Structures are given as structure tokens and as C-alpha cells.
């Protein structure tokens, strides 16, 4: 069977830059699935993406499906014919579905009986016939939240489509996709190269686009070029470019032919906090800021043009003129805001709604102030500083700078607090209250900041759950999942002595009578324990290990972490598998027991040597392990409990649990319950697979 290179390119208007990669990757994944489902042999599927195109190139694509033998078994002979030997309706219906008559069917005989059988040799369809529908289906499944319609057509896509190129080797596959007839015409760069040209063979892509169209279609190559050129440009001015991955991706999705240039701004703007300047450069203009080796912002920025200019100074000058008013605004806001103390903004918080049922930002501030102070007392932080940080926590939201540059919330609070002469840990807490903002983000750096960050997140969790608006599906408008995970990370990684039960109860108490959900405390704790499951799975822990610990519903996050590490280590022990199985057996036995058990094991009722020995071990371990459990030394406890393997095995091998004598039976069940209770002090290891 011959194989050829296949190319599909969809030429469009400018695609959404933040979605470009996901569109291309989804297109490739969808089309690969279509090929596999159709049984079309193929090699590597490579995707390409630029602002005005999505493309796939498939190596070694078979020109047709393989032929295949089809067998369809019909009704049993007894049901296929009546007493007179005439075909039944069931047999005729089956035959019609196969495109034959009953008398054309074969018969299949086995040890179990005889059936009608249809056999056929089905010739594989050509790739040329199959591909158009595959491409259309793959495009229809792209993750596009909002579709566009253009012109008089009723075709919908993420952006208007101008060209569709479908080539199998050197042949155009005729098709109409997204309202466009397929061809071998490709459009180049808007302002450089050839505006349109033809491609003779799929193997020429993407090199022909580079040479004739001045477009780097390879997304990763384009991104790598921007990164390398920006690093070199920064090095030339003695600095380091801030090449954050998200901005690098976005810029790579905005240009087809990247040209990296360096510009500057007036040094006087460096008096403004760097975060505000960086927000303007990165957020609004898509520029890369430059820092010196000490991490101080330089009065330069690097940007990427989408054209090779004969006079680059014109482009540089234009970008400098664009950014200057934005930096001047930041300077004005900074100077204006500092004429007031942060505390002076408190009354205005009363005019901003946090949530309709939960009150204003001033109401939230009062709750955070109280909760941060309470948490500080629990974790040994400065209570006065924590309450002060809580009072000022939302004041910067009322400043001109944060109103204009929203991503500077928190960090501007820190700068203004320092200007006002607030304690340094209070100022830092105002910035770090929102941390961690995302997976892997830094945690608050000092105890006051930890108290404020936890208070802010717990207030939101308690309030939103308290009015029954918990996350549903993918919808999480108040970012409760992130808030819950943030609280857990801070408590676990900072090893704070906080209990989710009392923490949630305190957060709920501060709402007074505003909450309507009577089960809010349990709902919040269950939700947070659910975040543990996702977090620890990402950390590489097995699902059954997590379930074994969650079964105990430990509400102290640091304690949960200690149990997880203990069970994970326990699984490496030679005795673990046998003891997990024994615990499962004990759990099942106790679940079926209907008689009330004794409070203690009565030594006088023990008869068999194996049960006497097990009881002796349990008494010794119970006394020995109490300090271990009290101190959270769960790993050491499980190592000690591993010594029970031999007496437990001996017990089950030689002792009849459900003895006929009631007192003996109940005593043995009580013995097993005491065994299980010891393990349950750490986790339910019966859940380990």
C-alpha cells in the first residue's frame, strides 16, 4: 500500500492569540483520532499555527484503508425458520440489514449451536474520499467558546476563513470546508513576501511558506526565535529580559515573522513602583521588561514587530511614543494616591459590594480583620500586626493606581503601606494576601502574611458556601477551588497548627446571621478535603493511599500530610500487603456482626493460643503507641504495627471467629475491633489495593 504526505492548511483572519496553541493541538488530536478510528495507517502528525493559519502535516499517510473481512452472525437456526422451513421475520430483517437474502447466508456451526452467518470482503475506502469529512469533523470539535459568522454565509468558525489547502502528495483533494473550496493556494505575510502562491507538494510545507510567504508556520520555532533574539537584545544593553512563559506564548501567537527590537523610556518613571510599570509594559503593550543583574528594572523594554522595516528606528520611536502616556499615567496615579493614607480609603469600601447577600467590602474587611487576628493567635504570629493588616487589606482597591491597573492590587497596598510608615510585616502581608495565586506560586513569607492570606480565603469560602453557591462543574466564579488549595498549601507547607474545623467555625461565626446554609461548616471542610485528593494525586500519591487517609477525615492539614507520608512509607514494607488484606477481612467481619461488642477483651474467655498471643501484642502496642499517635508520629506507629503480621496471620489460620459459644464469639469480634482501632488511629489501610 503506497503512502504519501498529507497537508491541510486553514487560512483565516487573525486567530485569538491566547487560544492559538490549544486550537492547533486540539486540531491535531482530533484529526489523529479520526485517522485511527478509520483505520488509516499514518506516521507523525505535526501541527503548525500562526496568527492567520492552522495546519497539519501527516507523514506516510496510507492512500486507502486496508481491505477487511466482515462477519455478522444472525439468528440461531431454530429462530431463523418456522416449522415449514420458511424464513422468520427476524431472519429476513437481519438479511436485509446485510444486503442479502436469507438463502444467500452461510451457516455457522459450533458446539453451542448453529446460526445464520454473513461474510463479506469489504474494500477499504480511499483516503481522498475520507479526508474531507475527517477535517470538517476535527474542526467542528475545536474548543471554541464563541463562533463567528461572516458575509452572507451561514458558516461558523472562530474567525473568517479565506483559504483551504488539502494535498495528498502532489494532488489536491477536492472538498468544500467551512464554505471554501479546497485548492493549492496559500497566502503569505500581509506586508512581506508573496501575498499568494501555489504549493505543488505537501512535502514543501512549511519551508515554502518561509521562503515565499515570509511566515514561520512552526509555532515552537517562532517562539524559540523570539526567546533567543530577546535574550541577545537584553544582553547587548547589559540586562536580562523578563520572558515569562505566558507572554512569550502570546507574542508568538501575534506575529508571523518576528523581529525583535529594543526601546527605552525616561528614567524618571523608575521612581514609580516597578510592578506598575511592568504591568503596563507586559499587560497592555506586550513588551518584555529588562532588569539588571541585581534585579532592578532598567529604563528599556524589548518588543516584537511583525515586519522587517527598512527603518527600524521609526518602529522603535512609535512604540516609545505609545508607552510613554501609560507610564505617565502610572506616575500621576502613584503621586496622587500617596497624598492619602491607606486607612483614609476605609469609608469608600462601604460603597463597593462584595456579594449581594454577604455585604460590602467594608463588611468583608471587618471579618478579615477579626479572623486574621484569631489565626495569628493560633499560629504564634503578631496579633496586633495581623489585625492591622486585615484592616488595611482591601484599601488599595480604592486607589487610582489599582483602579486603572487592576493586576497591581496587593503590591500597591504594600508600597503605600510602606509610605505610610506601617510595620514591614504588615506591608508585606498586604501584597502576599493573594498568594498562592496559581499552582506552584510562592507562599506568604511571614506569619502575619500567612494569617491574612488564610483569613481572606476562608472568609470567601465560608460566605459563598454559606449562601449555597458552591462551584458546579467548571463554573467557579469566586475561585473557591484555588482559595481552598491555597489555604491547605499554606497550612501544610508552613506546618501551621490549624484545624479546619475550628478555623471554618470561626469564619462562619463572623458572618452572624447572613448565612442560610445550616451545613456550611461540613460543606466547606468536605470541599477542602476534596482539594487534598487532587493535590496529592498531582504530587504522585496513589488514589487508594489518599482514600485510606481521607477515610479518617483528618481536619488538621499538617496532620493529614503526616498521615499521607506514613501510609506511603508503610506500603514499602514487606508486611503491608498482608496487613491491608487482613484489615479488609476484619472490616468485612465486623460489618456483618449484629451483636453488641464488649468494651474490652476479656482475657479469661480467650481459649486458643493464637488469640491469646494476638491479644498480648495488642495490649503492648496500645500502650506503646499512644504517645506516637498523640505526637503525630504516624510513620513510626505503622512500622510498629507491621509487627502484627505474624500474630494476625496465625489468628486467622487457627481461630474460628464466629464460634458457637456467644461469649467466645463476641470476645473474638471485640479483639478484632481493637486490632482495627489501632490501625484506624492512622488510616483505613483496608482500602489499600
From Swiss-Prot:
Keywords: Aminoacyl-tRNA synthetase, ATP-binding, Cytoplasm, Ligase, Nucleotide-binding, Protein biosynthesis
GO process terms (BP): arginyl-tRNA aminoacylation; glycyl-tRNA aminoacylation
Subcellular location: Cytoplasm
GO cellular component: cytosol
GO MF annotation: an example: glycine-tRNA ligase activity
Organism: Salmonella choleraesuis (strain SC-B67)
Family: Belongs to the class-II aminoacyl-tRNA synthetase family.
NCBIfam families cross-referenced by the UniProt entry: glyS
InterPro entries in UniProt: DALR_anticod-bd, Gly-tRNA-synth_bsu, Gly-tRNA-synth_heterodimer
Protein name (Swiss-Prot/TrEMBL): Glycine--tRNA ligase beta subunit
Known partners and oligomeric status: Tetramer of two alpha and two beta subunits.
Enzyme Commission number(s): 6.1.1.14
Catalysed transformations (reactions): tRNA(Gly) + glycine + ATP = glycyl-tRNA(Gly) + AMP + diphosphate
PROSITE patterns: AA_TRNA_LIGASE_II_GLYAB
Amino acid at each position: 500500500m503506497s503512502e504519501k504526505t498529507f497537508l491541510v492548511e486553514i487560512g483565516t483572519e487573525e486567530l485569538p492569540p491566547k487560544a492559538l496553541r490549544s486550537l492547533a493541538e486540539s486540531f491535531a488530536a482530533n484529526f489523529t483520532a479520526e485517522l485511527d478510528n478509520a483505520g488509516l495507517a499514518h506516521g507523525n502528525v505535526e501541527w503548525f499555527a500562526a496568527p492567520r493559519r492552522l495546519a497539519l502535516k501527516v507523514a506516510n499517510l496510507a492512500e486507502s484503508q486496508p481491505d477487511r473481512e466482515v462477519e455478522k452472525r444472525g439468528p440461531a437456526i431454530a429462530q431463523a425458520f418456522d416449522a415449514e422451513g420458511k424464513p422468520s421475520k427476524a431472519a429476513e430483517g437481519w438479511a436485509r440489514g446485510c444486503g442479502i437474502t436469507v438463502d444467500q447466508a452461510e451457516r455457522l456451526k459450533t458446539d453451542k449451536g448453529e446460526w445464520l452467518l454473513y461474510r463479506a470482503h469489504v474494500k477499504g475506502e480511499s483516503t481522498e474520499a475520507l479526508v474531507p469529512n475527517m477535517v470538517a469533523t476535527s474542526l467542528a470539535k475545536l474548543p471554541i467558546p464563541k463562533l463567528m459568522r461572516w458575509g452572507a454565509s451561514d458558516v461558523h468558525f472562530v474567525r473568517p476563513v479565506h483559504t483551504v489547502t488539502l494535498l495528498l502528495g502532489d494532488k489536491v483533494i477536492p472538498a468544500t470546508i467551512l464554505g471554501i473550496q479546497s485548492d493549492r493556494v496559500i497566502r503569505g505575510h500581509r506586508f512581506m513576501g508573496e501575498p499568494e502562491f501555489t504549493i505543488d507538494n505537501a512535502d514543501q510545507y512549511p519551508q515554502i511558506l518561509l521562503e515565499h510567504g515570509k511566515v514561520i508556520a512552526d509555532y515552537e520555532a517562532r517562539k524559540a526565535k523570539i526567546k533567543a533574539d530577546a535574550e541577545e537584545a537584553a544582553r547587548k544593553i547589559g540586562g536580562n529580559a523578563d520572558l515569562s512563559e505566558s507572554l512569550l506564548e502570546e507574542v508568538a501567537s501575534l506575529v508571523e515573522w518576528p523581529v525583535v527590537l529594543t526601546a527605552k523610556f525616561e528614567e524618571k518613571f523608575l521612581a514609580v513602583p516597578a510592578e506598575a510599570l511592568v504591568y503596563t509594559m507586559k499587560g497592555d503593550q506586550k513588551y518584555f521588561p529588562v532588569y539588571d543583574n541585581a534585579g532592578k528594572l532598567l529604563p528599556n523594554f524589548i518588543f516584537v514587530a511583525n515586519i522587517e522595516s527598512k527603518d527600524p528606528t521609526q518602529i522603535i520611536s512609535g512604540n516609545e511614543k505609545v508607552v510613554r502616556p501609560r507610564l505617565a499615567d502610572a506616575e500621576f496615579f502613584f503621586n496622587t494616591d500617596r497624598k492619602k493614607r491607606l486607612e483614609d480609603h476605609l469609608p469608600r469600601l462601604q460603597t463597593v459590594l462584595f456579594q449581594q447577600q454577604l455585604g460590602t467590602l467594608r463588611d468583608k474587611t471587618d471579618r478579615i480583620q477579626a479572623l486574621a487576628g484569631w489565626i495569628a493567635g493560633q499560629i504564634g504570629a503578631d496579633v496586633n500586626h495581623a489585625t492591622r493588616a486585615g484592616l488595611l487589606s482591601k484599601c488599595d482597591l480604592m486607589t487610582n493606581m489599582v483602579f486603572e491597573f487592576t493586576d497591581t492590587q496587593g503590591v500597591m497596598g504594600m508600597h503605600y503601606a510602606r509610605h505610610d510608615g506601617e510595620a514591614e510585616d504588615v506591608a508585606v502581608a498586604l501584597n502576599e494576601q493573594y498568594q498562592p495565586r496559581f499552582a506552584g506560586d510562592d507562599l506568604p513569607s511571614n506569619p502575619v502574611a500567612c494569617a491574612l492570606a488564610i483569613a481572606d480565603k476562608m472568609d470567601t469560602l465560608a460566605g459563598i458556601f454559606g449562601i449555597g453557591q458552591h462551584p458546579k462543574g467548571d463554573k467557579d466564579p469566586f475561585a473557591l477551588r484555588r482559595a481552598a488549595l491555597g489555604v491547605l498549601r499554606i497550612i501544610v507547607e508552613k506546618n501551621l497548627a490549624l484545624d479546619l474545623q475550628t478555623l471554618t467555625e470561626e469564619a462562619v461565626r463572623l458572618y452572624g446571621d447572613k448565612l442560610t446554609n445550616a451545613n456550611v461548616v461540613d460543606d466547606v471542610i468536605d470541599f477542602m478535603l476534596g482539594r487534598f485528593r487532587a493535590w496529592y494525586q498531582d504530587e504522585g500519591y496513589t488514589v487508594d493511599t489518599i482514600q485510606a487517609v481521607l477515610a479518617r477525615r483528618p481536619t488538621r492539614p499538617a496532620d493529614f500530610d503526616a498521615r499521607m507520608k506514613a501510609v506511603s512509607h508503610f506500603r514499602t514494607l514487606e508486611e503491608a500487603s498482608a496487613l491491608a488484606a487482613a484489615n479488609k477481612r476484619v472490616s468485612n467481619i465486623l460489618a456483618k456482626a449484629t451483636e453488641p461488642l464488649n468494651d474490652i477483651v476479656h482475657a479469661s474467655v480467650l481459649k486458643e493460643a493464637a488469640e491469646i498471643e494476638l491479644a498480648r501484642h495488642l495490649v503492648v502496642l496500645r500502650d506503646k503507641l499512644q504517645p506516637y499517635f498523640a505526637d503525630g508520629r504516624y510513620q513510626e506507629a505503622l512500622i510498629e504495627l507491621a509487627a502484627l503480621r505474624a500474630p494476625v496471620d496465625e489468628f486467622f489460620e487457627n481461630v474460628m471467629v464466629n464460634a458457637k459459644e456467644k461469649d467466645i464469639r463476641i470476645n473474638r469480634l471485640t479483639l478484632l475491633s481493637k486490632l482495627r482501632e489501632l490501625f484506624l488511629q492512622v488510616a483505613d489501610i483496608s482500602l489499600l489495593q
